[in-house]
Amino acid sequence: MAASWSPLVTLRSAARSRLTGRGVGCGARVIAIFPPAPGPRKPLWKAYTVQTLEGVRPTAASEAHSRALAVCHGPLAHYDFLIKAQELKNDEHQRRVVQCLQKLQEDLKGYNIEEGGLFSKLFSRNKPPKGLYVYGDVGTGKTMVMDMFYEYVEVKSKRRVHFHGFMLDVHKRIHRLKQSLPKRKVGFMAKSYDPIAPIAEEISQEASLLCFDEFQVTDIADAMILKQLFENLFKNGVVVVATSNRPPEDLYKNGLQRANFVPFIAVLKEYCNTVQLDSGVDYRKRELTPAGKLYYLTSEADVGTVMDKLFDELAQKQNDLTSPRILKVQGRELRLNKACGTVADCTFEELCERPLGASDYLELSKNFDTVIIRNIPQFSLAKRTQVRRFITLIDNFYDFKVRIICSASVPISSLFVYQHQDSESDQSRVLMDDLGLSQDSAGLSMFTGEEEIFSFQRTLSRLTEMQTEQYWIEGDRSRK
């Protein structure tokens, strides 16, 4: 066996491993996210769409799922098949949600949004069924059961997207639409123009079913348009299925100008049934076969040399030279100091100390299947900006199945230390002054750090799963 620092020998024999589900008991990850293929211009948001593993050589990790697809006709039968095959453990909380999704799958058979204007859709006899909003703690299987549903639902056009990526695309569409408007003539008042309705119509023409993973609202720009956007989508006949860590009532909790967001909650509950999936088990943290050693402490001897060797071994499999890499992101340049083919060697400072955002991390995820992240510090609310960037980075890497090798100052379980931050800290006072907020606003989540603490629980759970053999198999783009 190779030296203990190398995960690659473990991975070479990983195809012989038995499927244990997405974090054992949480089911197989039955789909993967790929970067969009080059070709004619497609809707921007398809870059975030999850697609099935078509044309990929099957491995032991996908055999049970493939057998289930061959004989089952719905998510409930698929779930029972995996339990009988001992790939999942029966979880009554999961089963209850799968039963709801089974009913929705049956109700949606043959459903399609009718052509015509909004008026004709409102009075159509082909009324869409209510969607489903599934919420619960991290690692309980929400994504797995939604993915089972997505595999079987029979509608003409459907899309499965990460909610953060979807909203990023919506803002791009808004910008593009505004840019296409005629320029205002000097001396003339510009007419107000609302781009939300036409964008909702555009999306409705592309999909009659939207499945959202990780439905969460942390950005005020998203919060202010959600009611109008989704009201238009629902009235156009779009059916929504979503997973979230929060119940609808807690979305954007303590957010800035939340009073303007609250009406969206009523809209969501009018068009979606709500069901909780909370078995009290984080299946990602159960015993799984590790993919070798992928997480190092910076205090370990020669850790820098070890990670250099890991990069060199990975780079040898690339048909490329090691050099700096420049990525184009929305007209900007994102420079990485060291990359080879689809492997990048980065420091935490490169990725999270610079002013980068979701669009940058999305571009990284599409260009690299393996990323080394060196010198991750221990986080606290004193470094809130870096915390948010790291959460967004890991969310994007996880969704695209990017494989990571890390060095950090502390173990995963200790990465975040909560220290109560006085709302009267210098940083908070400056921000409140800049926003023109009174002391009464000190309880907002942007000052208490509540949203970061909540989201980091998901990050820790995902980091744990990203160390497993199964995750590394699924992230191997050379098989695709």
Swiss-Prot record:
UniProt KW Nucleotide-binding keyword: yes
GO BP annotations listed: mitochondrial protein catabolic process; mitochondrial protein quality control; mitochondrion organization
Enzyme class: hydrolase
Annotated signal peptide: none
Main location: mitochondrion
Binding, ATP: G136, D137, V138, G139, T140, G141, K142, T143, L209, L210, C211, F212, D213, E214
Entry EC no(s): 3.6.-.-
GO MF term (any one): ATP binding
Keyword Membrane: yes
PANTHER family given in the database record: AFG1-LIKE ATPASE, ATPASE N2B
Purpose: Putative mitochondrial ATPase. Plays a role in mitochondrial morphology and mitochondrial protein metabolism. Promotes degradation of excess nuclear-encoded complex IV subunits (COX4I1, COX5A and COX6A1) and normal activity of complexes III and IV of the respiratory chain. Mediates mitochondrial translocation of TP53 and its transcription-independent apoptosis in response to genotoxic stress.
Family, per entry: Belongs to the AFG1 ATPase family.
Subunit structure: Found in several complexes of 140-500 kDa. Interacts with YME1L1. Interacts with COX4I1. Interacts with COX5A. Interacts with TP53; mediates mitochondrial translocation of TP53 in response to genotoxic stress such as mitomycin C treatment.
Protein name: AFG1-like ATPase
Source species: Rattus norvegicus (Rat)
Gene: Afg1l
